[in-house]
Every structure is written in C-alpha cells, then in structure tokens.
C-alpha cells in the first residue's frame, strides 16, 4: 500500500471561555484532536511516505497557530503545538524524500463554529456575519497546488485568509 500524500486536517475547538474559566474537558479534547491526532496519523504513515520516494505531508493548522485571541487559549495553544510538531518534523526529515507544508487558514465556513458552540446554530452563524469567509474548496485548491509542485520544491508555509480578515480577531463586521 503506497502512500504519497498525508493531509493532517485534524482540527476543532470547543468553547470560548477565558483562561480563568477554562473547561478542562474542552482543553483535553482540543489537544487530543489537534495535536495528538496529527501525531498519530503522521507516525502511522511516515514510513510509507518515505518509502514512496516523494512523500508530502500537509498539515492544516490555523492562523491561531501564530496568534491569540480572548477566550481562545485552549484552541490557540493546541494549534501552536500542532504547528510546532509540524515545523519540528520538517527539520527532522531533512535529507529524506518527504516535503512538508503547513497551511494556516483564517476564517473558513465549515461546521467548526457549530462544534465550538455545542450545536448553537445562531451563535455559529454570527461568527461569519458581515464577512465573506473562505470555504473548504479554497483550502483544497491550495493543497492541490502544493501537491503539484516538483519534488525538489518545498512550500514551507502558506497563510490564507478571507479578504475581510486581517488577524484572528480583527475582521470586517466585528466591532
């Protein structure tokens, strides 16, 4: 069974509480999903990616891997750790036939906010109010671009946001 590409798309957030009110179960879930999920898949498939002679690992982190925002410490800390795992692996695999790319999206309209807010559709919809967010197809197109580069080309990192978003917490429609 040959494996050429691994897309680590492990992600998710639960809650938006300040650190002083952190829900430890939410934090545990976010770290288990974002960090350990990425680690498990990478460890499991790395030998096959190396054996392919031209493997590619794409890790979907987030702009939250570089930024912080009020109430987001559980998610941003997990995404910082996921990014650190990916960037560390980049150095550890030097000389091996595996390329690594980190894609850090901003606001992408998926079920992310619905999960974060425990199924509260109104609260989830409000996240994207007044802006045009990215959609999953935007990220898929970037993955396709990265995967189509020649084997000697490594695209280390791509940050992609909607035009309406400048930082994790600064965007059109949010006062």
Each language-model region and where it sits:
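Substrate-binding pocket helix/loop in short-chain dehydrogenase/reductase
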Residues: 17-19, 26-28
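Active-site loop immediately N-terminal to the catalytic Tyr-X3-Lys motif
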Residues: 20, 69-73
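Active-site helix of classical SDR
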Residues: 42, 78-81
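A short, exposed helix-loop element centered on a Lys and neighboring polar residues
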Residues: 42-43, 87
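Alpha-helical segment proximal to the catalytic Tyr-Lys
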Residues: 47, 91-94
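Residue(s) in the substrate-gating loop at a strand-loop-helix junction
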Residues: 62
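C-terminal helical subdomain
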Residues: 102-106, 121-169
């Amino acid at each position: 069974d040959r494996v050429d590409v691994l897309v680590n798309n492990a992600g998710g957030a639960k809650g938006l509480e300040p650190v002083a009110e952190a829900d430890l179960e939410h934090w545990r879930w976010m770290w288990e999903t974002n960090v350990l999920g990425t680690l498990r898949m990478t460890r499991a498939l790395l030998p096959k990616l190396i054996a392919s002679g031209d493997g590619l690992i794409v890790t979907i982190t987030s702009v939250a891997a570089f930024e912080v925002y009020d109430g987001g410490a559980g998610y941003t800390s997990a995404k910082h750790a996921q990014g650190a795992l990916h960037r560390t692996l980049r150095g550890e695999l030097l000389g091996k036939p595996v390329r690594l790319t980190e894609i850090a999206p901003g606001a992408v309209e998926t079920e992310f906010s619905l999960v974060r807010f425990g199924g509260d559709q109104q609260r989830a919809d409000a996240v994207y109010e007044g802006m045009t967010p990215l959609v999953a197809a935007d990220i898929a197109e970037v993955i396709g671009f990265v995967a189509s580069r020649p084997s000697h080309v490594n695209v280390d990192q791509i940050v992609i946001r909607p035009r309406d978003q400048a930082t994790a917490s600064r965007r059109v429609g949010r006062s």
